[in-house]
């Protein structure tokens, strides 16, 4: 319902995470993603961006589970490059998994939204582009102010922008009170 309301308010893209209907906890369940995608596609032409984050997964099959949303043929899927300390744990994105995920997205015809949380993540994304795993132009999401990633400041935003590949299309996000200042400066 929130994605459809956002589209009705003028959003061109919706980024989707799903939650357990009983507990409200973040989950990576293909059936829930499928239900959300179906409901959105029934009434709108909004661009659908499904997450592949899986930071909450504690499963030996997590790497494969994270890529299940590709089965739904979304327009876009997030591709988190690099690992990050996050919410009392580690948001693990090995170089091998990132490369495999980029390849799977390319084969599926899904545009990756390359989420970068620190400067080193831009280096890894550039490697993926140079290796032909991500088509040019790439779309980079500069994620600022996420705990233990790069701080949400104008200086950080400018430095991230400076290091992007020349052809990159980019956008930015930041949590809570940092969102408006970061998106304003991004314009």
Go through each PLM region and give its residues.
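Alpha-helix-loop-beta-strand connector modules within alpha/beta enzyme cores
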Residues: 24-52, 100-107, 159-167
């Amino acid at each position: 319902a929130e994605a459809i309301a956002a589209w009705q308010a003028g959003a061109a893209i919706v980024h989707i995470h799903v939650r357990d209907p009983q507990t409200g906890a973040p989950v990576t369940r293909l059936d829930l993603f499928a239900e959300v995608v179906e409901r959105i596609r029934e009434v709108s032409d909004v661009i659908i961006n499904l997450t592949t984050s899986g930071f909450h997964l504690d499963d030996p099959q997590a790497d494969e589970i994270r890529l299940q949303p590709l089965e739904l043929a979304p327009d876009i899927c997030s591709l988190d490059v690099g690992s990050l300390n996050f919410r009392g744990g580690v948001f693990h994105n090995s170089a091998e998994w990132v490369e495999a995920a980029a390849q799977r997205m390319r084969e599926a015809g899904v545009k990756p939204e390359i989420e970068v949380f620190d400067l080193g993540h831009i280096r890894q994304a550039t490697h993926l582009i140079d290796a032909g795993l991500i088509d040019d132009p790439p779309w980079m999401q500069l994620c600022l102010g996420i705990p233990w990633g790069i701080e949400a400041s104008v200086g950080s935003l400018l430095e991230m922008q400076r290091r992007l590949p020349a052809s990159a299309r980019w956008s930015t996000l930041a949590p809570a009170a940092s969102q408006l200042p970061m998106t304003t400066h991004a314009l």
